[in-house]
Amino acid sequence: MYNDEIGHYLELARENFYSIKRLPAVLREHVEATPEVMKDVVFFSCMAPLSIYNMRIRIPYLFDREMMGCQVQIFVIANQASGKNNIDFIQSDIMSLMKNFNNSELAREREYERRKARSKSKNIGDPPATTVFMLPASTSKVQVCRRALSVEERYGEPGGVFFYTFSPELGTAVESSKTGFNDLRVLNRVSYDLSGTYGQDHGSELSIHGTVNINQSLLYLGTPGVMANYFNLNSIENGNLSRAIIVPFKQAIGSAAPIFKPIPESDKAFSHKVLQRLFDEVFDSSNSKCLMPEKVVDISFLNAEVERFHEEMSNLAVEVQSEAVDTYRKRSSVSAYRIAAICYNIYNTENQLLDEDEQLPMCQIENNVKKIFRFAAYYILHSTLGIFGNTIETLNMQQKNLFKIVRKTGLYESLPEVFSREDIEVYSGKLFLKSPARSIIPKWLKNNRIVALGDGRYQKIYACQNSN
């Protein structure tokens, strides 16, 4: 199977990745404190909150004409009681500065509502334009649009602030939603790229009309059943899966619960300094109505690695004739490139806070980032195809069969001269039609296209005429 070959590339890339003596700050502390069995899970889980601290960086990509942001969509698949709560602790720790800011914005909204409730006058001013960007997975479409419009009104920059969604139990998050995963899938699909727009026009005075720019990073945790429900055939065909980073966490039956090492206080303090510096590159502390300027991060030194990855996987796709490998290698590379850019920016931020003799040389940073890209690219492709590969190949085969059908003849012409209701069902399936026999037969009888022969059999009229 082709995924075994990808797995071979992955193991070499993983070995090189874990040979890195110094990962970027924040990542370093959490990965080093993690037991071996969960290191991959923790590394990728950290990328979602870290992307929020890097929301102002823009990166040119070899195969894109426009700049990219660093949005990432992480889906951790694990059974119940498997230690997923550790991911909650880690992301909460990384997001602490952002959460404090987000909570202060929520407090401004609540204060306005209190003043509005106490005031006898209706003229208390417009509600404040707030920056509430940490959204539950259960947030409605209308509320998402309201949040995006509020951010745009405040900063004058559509999509300038990335939304962040964390869900420790994805299935529970949408249990009360009338649309289930549908709205969530659409939001996640359009928010992967900087140019993504999201909105509605329902013609209701209670709704938000129009579209907004949405950029979002997310970290979802869920059981295999929930994730299979989220990534159904329609969502796979529409591109949700190709945008996702699938992170499976499997433990052997009867294995002990993972035990994390404590992080030294000195490491915690330094990580906080790095996060504070990154936070200050997002929000302008001197002007509450301004974001910090976008920052172009050039990691073109990765281009050779990107081309190498694509060449290796393109050759494999041709060798095994797999459209799944050929399709999913492309966005695997994009997501890995974004992860590499985040790590590169953190390395440079870390160096700014260190004495010269403690700084990591630029050549070493670039070498480390190359290893990070290669590991991430193969991991994303391998995990996606390892879990959903058969489904993807089946979907591709169905699409091929659909396009092979020449629809010059309809159901009537395709049927034999004498046919039954069962024949109608069979031929309808071959032509991908959904018309039931109980509605077709009365119509054809009324229009004198068929005659009933009895015993549940029918004959075409032109066949009767030809036999005379």
What are these regions (language model features)?
Residues 1-468:
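Phosphate-handling catalytic cores of nucleic-acid transaction enzymes
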